Amino acid sequence: MDCETFEINGIYELDRGEQDKHYDFWWNLPQDYMVSSEWGLPPQFENGVVPGDLVGGKYGHKIHFWDLRARKNIQTIDLGENYQMALEIRPAHDPTKSYGFCGAVADNTNLQGAVFTWWRDDDGKWQAKKTIAIDPRPEDPDNLPEIIKGFGAVPVLVTDIDLSLDDKYLYVACWGIGEMQQYDVSDPFNPVLTGKVQLGGIAKETKHPN
């Protein structure tokens, strides 16, 4: 897009690499990189989540690293097919830092929610590892939707994450269990849970806190 006229000049991606889905993206201008995440293809969300695709690991589970100016995908990291819907990308606000976080909505093997820390290592390669795992909440199967009755638990469903401007706290929205959790991420590789607030959740019969 032209920054003066807002006319569309064309697509950004000159070389997508492995990318075939898209969701969120953030960039770091001084370091000339961009990070993007994945959700799903239009048929996978236009009429709601497709249970078979969710169980089959067909939603997004990769994060992509780009050369910002060259508009080229330079590296892709697969978080694992079980980590479905790798959505929100949250980099450190300090532009001299080369790390950030990505939230995964659900682990389709156990209904956990997860947050990954990603970073650039000393060799210039991007890495990622799971640094937060949030357990599902046990529940009477009669109170659960059909797709998760067999688990006997409410999925966490990490639908959003946000990093405080001082890069100290990460806030994790656990939509399924109805919690907002706060983590001290002063050490981004070892987050520490410091607080949480209950706001409702599946099977709680509580109004959605919009």
For each of these PLM feature ranges, what is it?
Residues 37-58, 102-116:
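Short, conserved, GDST-rich strand-edge loop motifs in beta-rich repeat architectures
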Residues 7, 59-63, 98, 111-113, ...:
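Repetitive beta-architecture junctions, highlighting loop-to-beta-strand starts
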Residues 35, 99-101, 171:
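Structural core positions within WD40/WD-like beta-propeller blades
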Residues 3-6, 65-71, 116-131, 182-194:
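Short loop/turn segments immediately following beta-strands, especially the blade-tip
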Residues 1-41, 64:
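Aromatic- and glycine-enriched pocket-lining scaffold segments that form the walls
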Residues 22-24, 85-90, 102, 147-163, ...:
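Signature of short aromatic-glycine-proline-rich micro-motifs recurring in repeat-based ectodomains
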Residues 8-20, 73-84, 127-153, 194-210:
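Surface-exposed loop and turn segments in beta-propeller and other repeat-based domains
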Residues 30-32, 96-98, 166-168:
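Short coil/turn segments that connect the beta-strands within blades of beta-propeller domains
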